[in-house]
Structures are given as structure tokens and as C-alpha cells.
Amino acid sequence: MLDSVASTLQLSELLSLTKAEQSIRLAEINVELEMLSAQERVAWALQNLEGAHAVSSSFGIQAAVMLHLVSKQQADIPVILTDTGYLFPETYQFIDELTKSLNLNLKVYRANESANWQEARYGKLWEQGIEGIEKYNKLNKVEPMRRALNELNVKTWFSGLRREQSQSRAGLPILSIQNGVFKFLPVVDWSNKDVHYYLKEHGLSYHPLWEQGYLSVGDTHTTQKWEPGMSEEETRFFGLKRECGLHEEDNEQDGSGI
């Protein structure tokens, strides 16, 4: 199947192409990737996408799916967490539980300035509208993630983004290139039902706050419990935006959740 389209994809070769040429090449591959199961996609990516691989996780509501899916095929794959210092206590507990139960190779990255130092310098950025939120995200998520990808020499970045999660993710492809790195989304076409059945089949758990009515979990100060009439994306960043910058190109907004 995909052997007819690509063997080992050389990132440097693709980066030498124009954006239009890259799009055509990636579109050909994505057509065939859409026909594979998530497990088959992961296997293909590990075999055919060059360089070091890593998976990012915010250890959110459905994080166990991607962490299990990828680590079962490459046990030592680095799991990158950007710790803002403002995660829920339940999130830190969930990180410890999954790291132990799945034997994860966890790599934690943080901002160069501590949370308290940032508040002293800039105030509570998340209370300063879109500009404040974007600066906060750039300091605490974007820069630490870029540093992680560079230090770990990552060429292929796995993420658990799904099209169903928000309007901004509805058109995401399985394979893309973002800021000079392969981005691979093996469960991008999964529904909430698919996620639920996978968790149940493999004896995995949702984030503890799922039982308390949270659909999406990030920092304590920019996460809301779901209320009737709200979409999932409206439970984050006061409904002002869905993405936090991690999954956006440099020429887009500075500052997307995982």
C-alpha cells in the first residue's frame, strides 16, 4: 500500500521543496494513511519517518490513548510534557500514575522563568486578554516544547490531536510538516466513542477530572468545567481561543493544546 508512495521519508529532502510541492507530496501519502488503522499508522511512521521520534502529551482527559498506542510499539519513545506549574493536582497525580503503569520515558520541560517570577514580572498574563494569554502560552508551552524538540533532536513528533475536538482542528491531516519537523496524528479521525472503546479495551483510565464534568483539562486558571450548552473548546481560555501555540506554525499565532 504505502510502499508504493514512500519508503523512508527524508525530512531534509521534503524541506528543500516549495510549500506547494510539499503539499502535493504529503497529500498523496495522507490519502493512503487515512485507510490504515491507528496502530498501522504508528507502525508506518516509526518505520518510514526518519530521525528521532517523540510524543507530546499534556496528560489531559484522554491522554492515555496516545501514550499507550505509541509506547506499545516503541517502549522508550520520549514523552514530552511542558509543565507550566499551574496544572491541576489531579493532573500531576495522573502523570505519575501513567508514567508508572505504562513505563513511560517522561521528559519534563519548563519555562526558563518560574511561575512566581513570571507573575512578579508580568502579572497574571491569563487575565490580560488574548495578548496576555498568547504571551503566557509562548513562555510556558511554545518555548519549552521547541527546546525539547531541539535538545532531543526530534524529527518526528507524535500528537493526539483529533478533528472532532474543535473547529480549528477539523481539517488536520495525519502527516504534515510543522516548523521543520514531521507532525504525525494517528488518531486524528477518531471520535469520542472510539477513544472510549480503546480505553475500555485496554483497561485504561480517563483523567480523574473527567468524572467531575471536565471535557478538556489544561491549567487551573484557564480551564472550566463543562456546562450545558458549551462546546469542548469553550471550556478552555475563557472561550477566547482553543489553541495554545504548540501546534501552530511560527508564522501563525504565537502561543494549541495537546
UniProtKB/Swiss-Prot annotation:
The keyword Heme does not apply. GO terms for molecular function: phosphoadenylyl-sulfate reductase (thioredoxin) activity. It is found in: Cytoplasm. One of its GO terms (cellular component) is cytoplasm. Pfam families: PAPS_reduct. Its EC number is 1.8.4.8. Gene3D superfamilies: HUPs. Keywords: Cytoplasm, Oxidoreductase. GO terms for biological process: hydrogen sulfide biosynthetic process; sulfate assimilation, phosphoadenylyl sulfate reduction by phosphoadenylyl-sulfate reductase (thioredoxin). Belongs to the PAPS reductase family. CysH subfamily. NCBIfam families: cysH (TIGR00434), PAPS_reductase (TIGR02057), PRK02090.1 (NF002537). This is Phosphoadenosine 5'-phosphosulfate reductase. It comes from Vibrio vulnificus (strain CMCP6).
